[in-house]
Structure formats: C-alpha cells, structure tokens
C-alpha cells in the first residue's frame, strides 16, 4: 500500500523542482542556439 499523496517528501519536491528548472534552462539554451545557427546560415 502506497502512502497518500498528501505525505510528500520535501526533498523529493525540491529535487523535482530542480530537475524542472534545469530542463527549462536547457530548452531555453537550445532554442537560443538554434536561432543563432539560423541567423548565421542566413548571413552566409
């Protein structure tokens, strides 16, 4: 039997938030990189 969801390990929550934040930053970085590459290709 799993404990109810109301009992959440604070550390788990923190880790989840951290992972989400990292993933979001990487996505932002990737889109920026793609845009840079596109601009470079356009100028060639």
UniProtKB/Swiss-Prot annotation:
Record-linked InterPro entries: Corticotropin-releasing_fac_CS, CRF
A GO cellular-component term linked to this record: extracellular region
Domain of life: Eukaryota
Residue numbers bearing the Valine amide modification: 44
Cellular localization per UniProt: Secreted
Pfam families: CRF
PROSITE patterns the UniProt entry points to: CRF
GO molecular function: hormone activity
Keywords: Amidation, Hormone, Secreted
Family designation: Belongs to the sauvagine/corticotropin-releasing factor/urotensin I family.
Function: Regulation of fluid secretion. Stimulates primary urine secretion by Malpighian tubules and causes a dose-dependent stimulation of cAMP levels in the tubules. May act as clearance peptide in that it may remove metabolic waste from the hemolymph.
Name by which UniProt lists this protein: Diuretic hormone
Organism of this sequence: Musca domestica (House fly)
